[in-house]
């Protein structure tokens, strides 16, 4: 009988990313700190989804899902760094970025359903920025 987290599509995508990123890293010629960080951040996505799904309180579940969300964004940044440092071609990371985008969307939805927003309200930010500009102009 599978564990509950194994039934989650987001968890399955996290495993898919871990497999994809492992294949990418094995093809890299040099070992870098970014490569090591990608492995840790990629693993963290699946691990935090699993742990969070096992928590009983919404607050605890949300905390682990937020960490998984952050790890997915970190993984995307690691891919960008590998390209920027010429460790791999930009065309080599497209599939990984696509998987990560899907994971981020799913985690955002899960957090939203738990009543936890992971982003500030854009209209409030825009209004505050406008108010600050007006105050500076005076």
Predicted regions and their residues:
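Amphipathic alpha-helical assembly/interaction segments
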Residues: 1-138
